[in-house]
């Protein structure tokens, strides 16, 4: 093992933060230093060049000196695992020609004052590392264990009379009737099952995978029910099948879209092209990943996002993920620096991450995966909820909801899968198998606390989004072949790993298969058959390809550097045979890292070839119907619970001034900015509405909108609805409200008909907890049989997670008492005390929870509505309430913020409900018609926090004050302001009052719609009623309450100085916001005369593995008159493409090699460490007739090639943002006078631009270099001054520098993303007088002019 030491691993503020936490345990403990350490295992008998390794890793051979009084600890990836960092870095170092098996990274932390006491050492260790993902070592030499390979695991046979014990030991979560079924089937086969067969059966038949409860028969309160839950959901599609192309039969549903043209490279020539305008389709899917997120929030949420992305990609014969959504429901946050009166102390489950950790780390994991894969996340929700119900029982989201969903494009001719034929190759596409995520399907199907802690760890997965990007590129290349797509049928690999995915692939086509485990790619030779077959290593797909197309498929994979293995063959006999060497060796050569197998014909395979286990039998040899045929069907016998006991909130004693502040500060209502700015929202170039709105960029959009293509203004919209706390009082109402809220949110988009809206329903419940099963049935029936059919809404896709409970004994980390009905609470519980007694059994149970995601095609996206109030004309705000005159407060946020920890909270009473479905239809049609008539200036739905929250948010977004008048809304100001009935607030011009009132009357909603407020220019919000002022707040006072959660979370998670700077700017009523200024006319196409000549210069759209911004880059160049070509670095390395054939190239944005060695460094290394490639680039830059553009990752890469770029010697390097966070913002740029060929005639302009990067802070070698560098773009504030304040300057670059050019202007690099906004509609906000062409299109047209 070689050990090299790198740069400092902790920034000053992170070091100080960690030291402060350590000193709460050991006051004398000090951190004296922290460094990255690289552990390298060379190939056997090989000696890597140490100087090259040091250059690539930016490391030193000698470690930093340790203080005399300090000792070192090493934080490394958990022993026995392979980190995502290692996967990508090892590939990069090998690609540079270095003979290594693996490189791994850890952190050396030097500490002075290390305690002698063992218990203190253990406590400190817990702060230094996360035992779910890391190990803590006492020396660098101990890291040798990272590379230890245990002896290969062996196959085990389980006696039929030992199935119950195996069920417990392996965490199979099998019911007794399933165990009896297995005993019967294997008894008939005359043999004992193998452990791998049992695990495969458990995964394939887990609640997570087979939805046994949703397919069960039911008896409720002694009465048999006619329909299963799933049958009631399917009823919605039966009643409204129109506009749905695929339902319940694939990884995602597919619905009709608008006419559009796909833009992608020609598979034969590589030239980008717009295809014919055809009716489009889009896939919709929403998943949850609750159990893994509860155990390890970052990887749990990351792989949740990754799994849903794969679902969209594996729809039909290949989809393309386009835009994502996310959501979290957790218990009280209990932020140490922001204590809240409604957050009572409570003992928490020691086996699960607390809510605060989940919300600090989980969203980062989900965002990081989306960012690196290259999918914008445009929508989300966040709920914090916790409520005492009785002794030892809390209704809460200790087991969180982690929602991951989205929509993807799919060609109409790719929607239907083709059945596999006998002889077809079974392929695993993607990364290698590792011992991670073992048993996740079964683990997520049981209550937390019912499985051993070691099984909790085993069920957590690890993420590698850059690998998933490569897989998607392969899928895209196959789909581009149209009817010649070699993929017949495929699935993503998720719960259960290959043991679920491959049998599903075969079963769905009515075939069997022979699978050779020896051909499965793995980075761990110690895996037993069970571990190899059942692990849930991520970023994998299984697919069927005809044998005759294997060579073609292999060439596509080789170009994308995407590993794959042909592991088996389909057979006519419906039998599954899995073993080692069950297929002839054939040709085992490969084109990607010696990992691709080519199969021989099926009839040469032997069922009983030798393989290396201690057992002479095959690991798996079963008829397919053992897995899919006649397993026992579940029956549920349920009874309704008694009436809820929570008292009703009495508003007479409340203070309105205080109530307003508390409601806005509740995390469910408060600003979600800290959850939004970490996620890229512009990648792909097709975003038309993200969360941020207006010149002041607040996250208040009601829905997300994407464009169907680059040449249309039509597209798709999606929204979320959820009102889960209401289910504790009325489960059916909660379900109706979720559907209603999804619709009121979606009304902000130009949706034309209700029947075009398709819903995804995600159901969560604590199955088996007293009364919950009956409430779940009520909720499903309420929307499946009643509401959705009445409104012509269908639910063609969904998911359930029915183990939403956690139980534990105080002081016993290993406790768990089964997945049955709720145990009787311990008699030792003291009802009035928040402090439990050791040994006491506690339980946390979530409400029945329905999350609705709504999707629909939309018309002209330029007619969308947002909560941004229009200023400059007399206007008024109207509230349209759908409660039928009722103002029900049961379950409201107002009730939650007045929880009393000495008694049951006053949460009860009648809840909001959708009493009349047709009233919602009338509302939808009113908003549609008013928008089409141009009557609506702004729109915001009413939800958590009531009309008061909606009005305040509109005021915040617009830097407006409000005069709110309640005279038309009753005598109780609390009910008027804080009821959460369905509805919306709209802004209309005062002169349009009569026209709007007439339209309201025509839709029979006159009694539902009244004026409620008037915008003012003063920084105050006033509420009046009954002829007097009831309350008045300063604008900043309310804003501070609303921003408090974001500020506190940012200070804990990010650079606290950055958090303070953003708060100061955000709360400034007089802040300028985005103030664009143009010195040119974007509609003037300066390239038109050159394009008219018919000459289109060739430009290479350059990408490396992990790059994801090539499509939008190509489109901009094509719009400007170029011929763009898709060029992968592998094309240049292998000589398929010659760089000299192009007049220019663009290095695109993304995460090349996952940015493992620093952003862009891996890409640059792949050029600089290959002499031929380095020479080719140097020759290209030396020519006077060429140009180059580097954006984001391409900018970072080109900055490291400055030694071979003439006139670039003063360029900086780009390092971690000052906030130490990925920053996705819309920032204001000034175009600086420079020689850049891209920016001619634009100097002096101030233009909003999309920013999305984690390492954009420019650092120059010296002040001389900074002064001499040719700056082309810089961040400014709304008044035109150079921006130094965060987030106006999102990365902390000196003087706001974010774009530079070479001395002759031919090579320009910039960190922001002008290529993502070729049209004004792509911008988060733009002035109303701008035309359709974005100012940034001028950059590309300037390049065309330069070419002549």
From Swiss-Prot:
Superkingdom to which the source organism belongs: Bacteria
Gene3D superfamilies: 3.40.50.880, Phosphoribosylformylglycinamidine synthase, linker domain (1.10.8.750), PurM-like C-terminal domain (3.90.650.10), PurM-like, N-terminal domain (3.30.1330.10)
Keywords: ATP-binding, Cytoplasm, Glutamine amidotransferase, Ligase, Magnesium, Metal-binding, Nucleotide-binding, Purine biosynthesis
Residues at the active site: 1192, 1313, 1315
Binding-site positions, ATP: 300-311, 701, 943
SUPFAM superfamilies to which the protein is assigned, alphabetical: Class I glutamine amidotransferase-like, FGAM synthase PurL, linker domain, PurM C-terminal domain-like, PurM N-terminal domain-like, PurS-like
Pathway annotation from the record: Purine metabolism; IMP biosynthesis via de novo pathway; 5-amino-1-(5-phospho-D-ribosyl)imidazole from N(2)-formyl-N(1)-(5-phospho-D-ribosyl)glycinamide: step 1/2
GO MF terms held by the record: ATP binding; metal ion binding; phosphoribosylformylglycinamidine synthase activity
Alphabetical list of InterPro entries matching this protein: Class_I_gatase-like, FGAR-AT_N, FGAR-AT_PurM_N-like, PurL_large, PurL_linker, PurM-like_C_dom, PurM-like_C_sf, PurM-like_N_sf
SMART domains per UniProt: GATase_5
Function: Phosphoribosylformylglycinamidine synthase involved in the purines biosynthetic pathway. Catalyzes the ATP-dependent conversion of formylglycinamide ribonucleotide (FGAR) and glutamine to yield formylglycinamidine ribonucleotide (FGAM) and glutamate.
Protein name: Phosphoribosylformylglycinamidine synthase
Taxonomic placement: Bacteria, Pseudomonadati, Pseudomonadota, Gammaproteobacteria, Lysobacterales
Gene: purL
């Amino acid at each position: 093992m070689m050990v090299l030491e790198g740069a400092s691993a902790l920034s000053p503020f992170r070091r100080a933060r960690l030291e402060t936490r350590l000193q709460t345990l050991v006051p004398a403990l000090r951190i004296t230093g922290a460094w990255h350490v690289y552990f390298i295992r060379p190939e056997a008998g090989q000696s890597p060049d140490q100087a090259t390794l040091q250059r690539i890793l930016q490391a030193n051979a000698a470690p930093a000196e340790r203080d005399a009084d300090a000792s070192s600890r090493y934080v490394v990836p958990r022993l026995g695992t392979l980190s995502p960092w290692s996967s990508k870095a090892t590939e990069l170092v090998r690609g540079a020609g270095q003979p290594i098996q693996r490189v791994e990274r850890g952190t050396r932390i030097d500490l002075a004052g290390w305690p002698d006491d063992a218990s203190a050492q253990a406590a400190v260790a817990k702060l230094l590392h996360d035992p779910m993902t890391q190990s803590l070592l006492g020396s660098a030499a101990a890291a040798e264990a990272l590379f230890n390979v245990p002896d290969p695991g062996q196959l085990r046979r389980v006696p039929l009379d030992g199935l119950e014990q195996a069920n417990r030991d392996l965490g199979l979560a099998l019911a007794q009737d399933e165990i009896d079924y297995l005993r019967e089937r294997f008894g008939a086969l005359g043999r004992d099952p193998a452990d791998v067969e049992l695990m495969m059966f458990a995964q394939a038949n887990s609640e997570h995978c087979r939805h046994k409860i949703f397919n069960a028969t039911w008896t409720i309160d002694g009465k048999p029910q006619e329909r299963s839950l799933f049958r009631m959901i399917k009823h919605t599609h039966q009643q409204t099948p129109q506009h749905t192309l695929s339902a319940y039969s694939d990884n995602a549903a597919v619905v009709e879209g608008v006419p559009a043209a796909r833009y992608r490279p020609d598979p034969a020539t590589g030239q980008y092209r717009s295809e014919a305008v055809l009716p489009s389709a889009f896939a919709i899917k929403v998943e949850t990943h609750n159990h893994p997120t509860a155990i390890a929030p970052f990887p749990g949420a990351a792989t949740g996002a990754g799994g849903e992305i794969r679902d969209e990609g594996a729809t039909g014969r290949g989809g393309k993920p386009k835009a994502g959504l996310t959501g979290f429901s957790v218990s009280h946050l209990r932020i140490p620096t922001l204590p809240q009166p409604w957050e009572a102390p409570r003992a928490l489950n020691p086996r699960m991450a607390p809510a605060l950790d989940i919300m600090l780390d989980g969203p980062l994991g989900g965002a990081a995966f989306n960012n690196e894969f290259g999918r914008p996340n445009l929508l989300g929700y966040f709920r914090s909820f916790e409520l005492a119900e009785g002794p030892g029982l809390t209704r809460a989201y200790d087991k969180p909801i982690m929602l991951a969903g989205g929509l993807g494009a799919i060609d109409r001719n790719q929607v239907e899968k083709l059945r596999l034929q006998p002889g077809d190759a079974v392929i695993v596409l993607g990364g290698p198998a590792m011992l991670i995520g073992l048993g996740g399907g079964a683990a997520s199907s049981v209550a937390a606390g019912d499985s051993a802690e070691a099984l909790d760890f085993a069920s957590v997965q690890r993420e590698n989004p850059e690998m998933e990007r490569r897989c998607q590129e392969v899928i895209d290349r196959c789909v581009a072949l149209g009817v010649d797509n070699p993929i017949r049928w495929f699935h993503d690999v998720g719960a259960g790993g290959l043991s679920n995915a491959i049998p599903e692939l075969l079963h769905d086509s009515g075939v069997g298969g022979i699978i050779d485990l020896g051909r499965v790619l793995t980075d761990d030779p110690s895996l037993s058959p069970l571990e190899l077959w059942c692990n849930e290593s991520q970023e994998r797909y299984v697919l069927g390809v005809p044998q005759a197309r294997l060579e073609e498929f292999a060439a596509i994979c080789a170009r994308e550097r995407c590993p794959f293995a042909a592991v088996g063959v389909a057979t006519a006999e419906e039998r599954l045979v899995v073993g080692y060497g069950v297929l002839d060796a054939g040709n085992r050569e490969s084109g990607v890292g010696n990992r691709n197998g080519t199969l021989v014909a099926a009839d040469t395979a032997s069922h009983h070839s030798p393989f290396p286990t201690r057992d002479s039998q095959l690991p798996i040899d079963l008829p397919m119907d053992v897995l899919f045929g006649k397993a026992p069907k579940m029956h549920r016998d349920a009874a309704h619970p008694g009436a809820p006991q929570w008292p009703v909130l009495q508003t007479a004693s409340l203070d309105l001034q205080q109530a307003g502040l508390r409601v806005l500060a509740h995390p469910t209502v408060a600003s979600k900015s800290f959850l939004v700015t970490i996620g890229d929202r512009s990648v792909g170039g097709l975003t038309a509405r993200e969360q941020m709105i207006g010149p002041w960029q607040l996250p208040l959009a009601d829905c997300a909108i994407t464009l169907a293509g680059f040449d249309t203004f039509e597209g798709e919209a999606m929204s979320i609805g959820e009102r889960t706390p209401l289910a504790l009082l009325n489960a059916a109402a909660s379900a109706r409200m979720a559907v209603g809220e999804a619709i009121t949110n979606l009304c902000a988009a130009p949706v034309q008909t209700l029947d075009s809206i398709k819903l995804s329903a995600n159901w969560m419940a604590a199955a088996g907890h007293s009364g919950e099963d009956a409430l779940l049935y009520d909720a499903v029936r309420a929307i499946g049989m009643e509401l959705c059919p009445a409104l012509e809404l269908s639910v063609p896709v969904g998911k359930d997670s029915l183990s939403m409970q956690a139980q534990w004994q105080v002081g016993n980390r290993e406790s768990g008492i089964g997945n049955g009905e709720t145990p009787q609470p311990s008699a030792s519980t003291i009802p009035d005390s928040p402090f439990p007694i050791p040994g006491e059994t506690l339980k946390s149970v979530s409400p029945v929870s329905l999350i609705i995601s709504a999707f629909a095609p939309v018309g002209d996206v330029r007619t969308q509505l947002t909560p941004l109030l229009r200023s400059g004309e007399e206007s008024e705000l109207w509230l349209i309430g759908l409660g039928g005159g009722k103002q029900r407060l049961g379950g409201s946020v107002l009730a939650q913020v007045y929880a009393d920890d000495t008694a049951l909270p006053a949460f009860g009473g009648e809840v909001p409900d959708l009493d009349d479905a047709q009233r919602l239809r009338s509302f939808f049609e009113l908003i549609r018609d008013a928008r089409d008539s141009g009557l609506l200036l702004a729109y915001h739905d009413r939800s958590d926090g009531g009309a008061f929250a909606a009005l305040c948010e509109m005021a915040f977004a617009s830097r407006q004050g409000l005069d709110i008048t309640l005279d038309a809304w009753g005598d109780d100001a609390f009910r008027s302001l804080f009821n959460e009935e369905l509805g919306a607030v709209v802004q209309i011009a005062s002169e349009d009052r009569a026209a709007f009132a007439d339209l309201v009357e025509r839709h029979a909603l006159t009694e539902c719609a009244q004026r409620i407020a008037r915008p003012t220019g003063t920084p105050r919000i006033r509420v009046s009623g009954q002829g007097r002022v009831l309350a008045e707040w300063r604008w900043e006072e309310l804003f501070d309450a609303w921003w408090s959660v974001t500020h506190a979370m940012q200070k804990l998670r990010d650079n606290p100085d950055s958090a303070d700077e953003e708060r100061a700017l955000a709360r400034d009523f007089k802040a300028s916001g985005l103030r664009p200024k143009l010195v040119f006319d974007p509609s003037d196409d300066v390239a038109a005369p050159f394009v008219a000549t018919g000459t289109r210069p060739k430009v290479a759209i350059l990408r490396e593995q992990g790059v994801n911004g090539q499509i939008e880059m190509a489109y901009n160049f094509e719009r400007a008159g170029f011929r763009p070509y898709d060029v992968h670095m592998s094309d240049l390395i292998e000589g398929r493409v010659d760089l000299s054939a192009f007049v220019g190239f663009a290095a695109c944005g993304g995460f090349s090699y996952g940015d493992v060695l620093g952003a862009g460094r891996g890409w640059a290394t792949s050029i600089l460490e290959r002499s031929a490639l380095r020479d080719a680039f140097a020759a290209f830059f030396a020519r006077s007739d060429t140009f180059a553009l580097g954006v984001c990752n391409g900018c970072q890469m080109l900055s490291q090639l400055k030694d071979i770029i003439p006139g670039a010697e003063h360029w900086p390097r780009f390092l971690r943002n000052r906030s130490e966070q990925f920053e996705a913002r819309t920032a204001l740029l000034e175009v600086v006078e420079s020689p850049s060929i891209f920016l001619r005639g634009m100097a002096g302009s101030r233009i909003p631009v999309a920013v999305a990067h984690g390492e954009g802070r420019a650092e120059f070698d010296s002040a001389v270099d900074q002064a001499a560098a040719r700056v082309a773009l810089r961040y400014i504030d709304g008044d035109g001054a150079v921006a130094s304040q965060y987030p106006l300057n999102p990365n902390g670059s000196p003087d706001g520098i974010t774009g530079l050019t070479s001395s002759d202007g031919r090579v320009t690099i910039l960190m922001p993303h002008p290529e993502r906004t070729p049209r004004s509609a792509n911008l988060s906000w733009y002035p109303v007088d701008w035309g359709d062409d974005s100012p940034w299109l001028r950059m590309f047209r300037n390049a065309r002019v330069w070419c002549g």
